[in-house]
């Protein structure tokens, strides 16, 4: 018997930094519903999905990211997360790159991207250790305002433009929210 799929997860609740030391100043991320985030990603000209090793803590997320990759979104697999894609036999549009070099490249508007086709307009983050993701998002917030920073992570990320509220303690709601993002991308 299949588990009941939740719909209409309110990802706008609990918009406080997951770690209280991560207060960036007057400009903090806004929380959005999954369908809005999905629509933004769908309309992006050059989206990039950046994933990290925390996906191994929740392996079903690899399958969800592969689903996004099959929609034509290139995947930057940081740390050793590339192994999750290799193990599933999916390497199309998957690029292995360190988080810090990627952050450095993304700072520059004239960077040609992982595929040589140009800079990205929307960068989507998830599965990266909270402190690393916060640093990456902060760098982009302060050094390249042309990129829309979107987090579909289980944590509220203060330096993103768009994020979920904290869903870290409710994996079912988090999975449902990501499923809603993917469904909105298909419309």
Curated annotation (Swiss-Prot):
Query: What Pfam families has UniProt attached to this entry?
Result: CO_dh (PF02552)
Q: What InterPro entries does this protein's entry cite?
A: CdhB (IPR003704), DHS-like_NAD/FAD-binding_dom (IPR029035)
Blocked amino end (Met) PTM positions = 1
Looking at the record's lineage, which domain of life comes first?
Archaea
GO biological process entries: methanogenesis, from acetate
What quaternary structure, including any partners, is listed in this protein's UniProt entry? Heterotetramer of two alpha and two epsilon subunits. The ACDS complex is made up of alpha, epsilon, beta, gamma and delta subunits with a probable stoichiometry of (alpha(2)epsilon(2))(4)-beta(8)-(gamma(1)delta(1))(8).
Alphabetical list of NCBIfam families matching this protein: cdhB
Q: Which family does it belong to?
A: Belongs to the CdhB family.
Q: What does this protein do?
A: Part of a complex that catalyzes the reversible cleavage of acetyl-CoA, allowing autotrophic growth from CO(2). The alpha-epsilon subcomponent functions as a carbon monoxide dehydrogenase. The precise role of the epsilon subunit is unclear; it may have a stabilizing role within the alpha(2)epsilon(2) component and/or be involved in electron transfer to FAD during a potential FAD-mediated CO oxidation.
Official protein name in the record: Acetyl-CoA decarbonylase/synthase complex subunit epsilon
Organism of origin is Methanothrix soehngenii
Q: What is the lineage of its organism?
A: Archaea, Methanobacteriati, Methanobacteriota, Stenosarchaea group, Methanomicrobia
| Gene, per the UniProt record | cdhB
């Amino acid at each position: 018997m299949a588990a009941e799929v939740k719909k209409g997860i309110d990802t706008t609740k609990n918009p406080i930094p997951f770690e209280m030391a991560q207060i960036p100043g007057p400009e903090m991320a806004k929380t959005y519903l999954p369908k809005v985030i999905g629509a933004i990603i769908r309309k992006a000209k050059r989206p990039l999905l950046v994933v990290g090793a925390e996906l191994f803590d929740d392996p079903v997320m690899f399958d969800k990211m592969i689903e996004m990759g099959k929609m034509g979104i290139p995947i930057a697999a940081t740390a050793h997360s590339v192994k999750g894609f290799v193990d599933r036999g999916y390497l199309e549009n998957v690029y292995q790159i360190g988080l810090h070099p990627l952050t450095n490249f993304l700072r520059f508007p004239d960077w040609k991207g992982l595929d040589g086709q140009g800079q990205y307009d929307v960068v989507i983050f998830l599965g990266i250790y909270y402190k690393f993701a916060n640093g990456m998002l902060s760098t982009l917030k302060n050094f390249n305002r042309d990129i829309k920073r979107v987090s579909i992570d289980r944590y509220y990320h203060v330096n993103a433009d768009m994020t979920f509220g904290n869903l870290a303690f409710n994996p079912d709601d988090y999975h449902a929210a990501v499923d809603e993002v993917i469904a909105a991308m298909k419309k």
